[in-house]
Amino acid sequence: MEIDFVRLTGSIAYATLFIVAAGWDAWTRKIPNWTVAALAVLFLFAQLLTWSTPNWLSSFSAFGLVMLAGVPMFARRLIGAGDVKLLAVAALFAGMENLLLLLVATAIAGGALALVALAARPYAGVFGGWIRTRAGIPYGVAIAAGALHVGTTTGMLAISQRLTHLQL
């Protein structure tokens, strides 16, 4: 088993950036633009280095579809702008092939997060009123969970390659 260090570095960067965005969103309810920009740059490097990402057309189609649906939702204040941008950059990595998987995994994680938030409300005093004073849930956490699920399920985060030689 050979370890592909470029893939290993990319996988660590992918996971780290999504985890940082999720943590930042959980703490401040804002997703920093630099995390989204860094993920977009990572996607470009992944494409150039032939990492396990979908082709350009598939990736940008998924990105465009998420933006097309997300911008009106942001305009109606149903979702934050950072959430739309983070989901769109996650869609770049997922491509059209795995966009449904990304959206379903994100929705399931969001539902679980909402249940945890509801269950934690009676204990708001323990958290210094943090739960009660903040409306909604930090959906960046759910988006990051969905993106990490897609990364592990599709093999995008695999750090080794098994080389098979066929003799005909």
Question: Where is each model-derived feature located?
Answer:
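A membrane-topology feature that recognizes alpha-helical transmembrane segments
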Residues: 1-79, 84-168
